[in-house]
Every structure is written in C-alpha cells, then in structure tokens.
Amino acid sequence: LGDVYKRQDQGTVYTSSCSSDGVALFNVEYGYYTVAVHYQSASGIIFSGRLESLSLLPEQGEEVMKVQLQLARSKINALVIKEIYYVGCKGELGADYQADQYVTLYNNSDETVYLDGLCLALVDPMPGIVSPWVKYTDMKRIPVADMTWQFPGSGKEYPLLPGAETTIATNAVDHTGGEYQHANSVDLSKVDWGFWHVSLSKQNIVPGVKPLNLLLNLNSTAWMYSFPVVGPTFMIFGFEGISAEEYVNNPLNRENRSQASNKTKFYLMIPKEWVIDCAECVENEAKLANKRVPDELNHEPVYIPEGDYSGKSLIRKSAASTNGRFIYQDTNNAAEDFIVSKPSLKK
C-alpha cells in the first residue's frame, strides 16, 4: 500500500509505502492534511481510502498519532472513460463557448465489449457546492443529474473491439466551420454518437451520427444537454437483473436531495455496484474536497488548472502497449489517471 499526506494550506505532499502489516510512517510539520491510501493488486483489485481533514497542531504535542483509514474495494474496468472535454473554449469574437463538449469511451480489455443498453449520466450535484448526498447518505446509490442516456441495441448490435473507442458529443456538428466558425473549437460532425433528442430544441446533430436514447429526463424545462464547465462527474453504468424501463419508472428508485427545501425535485438513484467507470472533475484545487462519489468509484477528483473555456481536455494516461493496442491507466483515481492536454479531436 502507498500512503499520501497532503498539506491543505501549502499543497505540500508527503508519500510513503506501507509495511507488510499495513503501517506507513510519516514525519510531517504541523498543519491540516488530507490523507489518502491506494493499492492495486496484480489481479486488478484496487483498495483505496481517504481522510479529508486531519488536524496536526502544536497543542496536540509531539507524540506519535495513529490514523486508521477504512479501505474501499474496487476493480479495473474493461470499459473506461478515455477522454472528457468539458471546459469549452473561446469562440468567435472571444465569447465563451461550451456547445462543443464530448466524451470518449475506450475498450481497455482484450475482449469485445457491447455498448447495447449501457447508460451515460452526470452525477448530482455540480461541484461548486458540497454534495448533500455525500454529507447525509451512505452513498450506496448514486444520484443522476436530470437526464439518463442509453445506447440502443438488443444485446450485441454495437460491439466495441479491444483497443477501440467511441465518442459521444453534446452537439455533433463541425464547430469550426459552416454556421459556427469557432476556430478554437473542434469538428464533432464525424463522431459516432450524439446526446440528442427531439425534445431538446438547442441540441444539434448531423446526419450519420447516431443519437443515444434519452431514457429518462427529470427536468421537464430543459432545452439542451451540456456538461458543467466547472467540472462534471461523469459515469457509465448498466442495469443488472431488471429492464431499464422498469427500473427508472419505479418511484422507489427516485429520491429528493437530503435536507433540500424543494421536495418536488427528484433524482434517479443508481446502485453504486452498477457503475462501470466514473470520472470525477472539479473546477480548481479549492474544490477538491467536494466529492460526488464514494472512494471505490473514484479516489480523488481531477481539475484543469487553465480553467473554464481554456480549450483543454482531460485524457487518460497510457500505461502500456500490447500488440499495438494501448492499455490506459485505470486506478480509479482521476487525479492520477488523467492528464491535461489539448482535445484529441482538435486539428
């Protein structure tokens, strides 16, 4: 096991490896710390834990302090989020532009993955606030923010071969040409899929791009679908042992935000065991504590230092190559698994 102490007021990071009995020793300065532990076995099982706020103050003396972390268990995924471009860019005449967002999924295994029936969604809430779900619930179920999107297909219509990827755009058009002319943007007219539905009047898609199914929309006033530029938490999941329609239409699978004043606003709740992969993003370093999901889904959020509308993307690190097929790093820790880069679709 590897442990990390990070001083919150200065950003100083201390690292150490655990002994055979799971003990890591640190000699650190007084301050306020975030403590994290992570281990990945050869079989692909991941153990991780995190303590958000640990105070080490002079009045506590210089005696050794013992800190115990509860570990969460997870596993490496076959289907991973390879890239997520959400911050937007500076559009024509320097205006903020975010209609060009997309996410890319990748088959990180040596077996064919079928997309049929799998779902994509954002996790509630946006990262600017402390999650009431994390604060007040056990997080055994993950709240979906408004819309749940699903790949069509009856089971084996949409294969994704080992080392293959597929991209889904919020607006599947060429944002650099035609009526758009945003030179800093990307051409999304040739992607595979689009987040598009006839009820969303501001979504755009070109012929040849397949629309996902809008499985459920719990925001009847929405006229578009976009990722928050301040950092989305994006997840892939699949239904197990029940049809998608039966599950989403059961009122027992919808909840209010804990402690919320609005009792008419509901969110679809997904068992955390159904989540295949998750990318947890926040706006900046100051928001890293605003987690949306438990550690077994993602250990630490990631952010783009250049900020909103910077034209930057988050791309998963390549860990190895086998017979010409890239294998991407997947430790369920977005802060370690992704790097900031220009969008892969940017010419």
Regions found by a protein language model. Give the residues of each.
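Short, small-residue-biased leader/transition segments that mark boundaries at the very start
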Residues: L1-Y5
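Short beta-strand and strand-turn-strand segments in soluble, beta-rich domains
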Residues: D9-G11, I46-L51, P132-G155
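Structured interaction patches on ligand/partner-binding surfaces of diverse proteins
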Residues: T12, S41-K66, Q70
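Short, surface-exposed beta-strand/beta-hairpin micro-motifs centered on an aromatic residue
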Residues: S19-V28
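A short, solvent-exposed beta-strand micro-motif common in secreted/extracellular proteins
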Residues: V28-G44
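A structural motif detector for short, solvent-exposed N-terminal "entry" segments of globular domains
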Residues: L71-P127, K210, N219-G231, G241-N253, ...
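Solvent-exposed beta-edge/loop recognition patches
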Residues: K140-D337, S341-K346
